[in-house]
Amino acid sequence: VEAVRCGRRPFVPLDLLNMENLEACLKGYGLMPSAVPSAELENLNLAWHRLKPWPDSVEGLFRLKERFIVAPLSDGNTRLLVDMAKHAGLPWDTILGADVSEAYKPMPQVYLRACELLGVEPDRAMLVAAHDYDLDAARRCGLKTAYVVRANAHDPSKAAVVKPRDGWE
């Protein structure tokens, strides 16, 4: 992703970047990707499409959807997000993957293009996220921000000690 952000590489979908990283990881462990059946390699790469939501996410999204437009703004490509929604029952109104703006967070065009497509001025939009860099970039583009505490995926017990770096809304 960083090579795209820095302009050293043109935009490519996250699924392709994930596959490249998977292949590099396999090589790092002395395994040649060509030794893995292509269907198995592809299935492993698409694991991102089958992520389980945080336990409070689906209910929270349904509650937000009653009054607001709910749309993920993600570095994932649109198909990845469609698959996640179908797999997890996520009630999104629309999906804004990185392929929509052909850019990755925290590039300003990601946030501004999303507002443009939704017909919303940045100061009337809010990014809800668990990453300070993402919230910081959104705020610099004029969006309101809300920090959601999410524990380390490997140790959910740390949720109580996770704190935002800045004073988000």
Predicted features and spans:
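Glycine-centered short loops/turns at secondary-structure junctions
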Residues: 67-68, 142
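Pocket-edge positions in alpha/beta enzyme catalytic cores
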Residues: 10, 14, 49, 102-103, ...
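A metal-dependent, Asp-based hydrolase signature
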Residues: 1-42
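Surface-exposed cleft-lining segments at the edges of enzyme active sites
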Residues: 42-50
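Asp-based, Mg2+/Mn2+-dependent phosphohydrolase catalytic module
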Residues: 33, 58, 62, 73-169
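Solvent-exposed, charged/polar functional surfaces in cytosolic regulatory/catalytic domains
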Residues: 21-24, 28, 63, 67, ...
